[in-house]
Curated annotation (Swiss-Prot):
Subcellular locations according to the entry: Cell inner membrane
Species the sequence originates in: Legionella pneumophila subsp. pneumophila (strain Philadelphia 1 / ATCC 33152 / DSM 7513)
Summary of the function given for this chain in its UniProt record: Could be involved in insertion of integral membrane proteins into the membrane.
HAMAP family with a match to the protein in the record: UPF0161_YidD
Membrane topology, record value: Peripheral membrane protein
This protein's name: Putative membrane protein insertion efficiency factor
Keywords: Cell inner membrane, Cell membrane, Membrane
Family of the protein in this entry: Belongs to the UPF0161 family.
GO cellular component terms attached to this protein's record: plasma membrane
Pfam family, one: YidD
InterPro entries, per database record: Membr_insert_effic_factor_YidD
Length: 81
């Protein structure tokens, strides 16, 4: 992985980390999935890169709503809880 790619991933993940540290502790946990959507997005971007990771995160966020069943939704399908 090149330095530019690594820096880009860190820059894109910065707002996620800021949300996790500053906003998330102040609100009631409401994510219907495990791992949480912010953890999922951070991991997806770090593992798959910015473009595919963001697309995966957006897909996940679109499924996280009050009418969603939720549950265990790992980044890697073969992960066991």
């Amino acid at each position: 992985m090149g330095k530019i790619s690594l820096m880009l991933r860190q820059i894109v993940c910065l707002p996620i980390k800021m949300y996790q540290y500053f906003i998330s502790p102040l609100i009631t946990p409401c994510c219907r999935y495990y791992p949480s959507c912010s953890e999922y997005a951070d991991s997806a971007i770090k593992h798959y890169g910015v473009i595919k990771g963001l697309l995966m995160a957006l897909n996940r966020l679109s499924r996280c709503h009050p009418w969603s069943k939720g549950g265990y939704d790992p980044l890697f399908p073969n992960d066991k809880n």
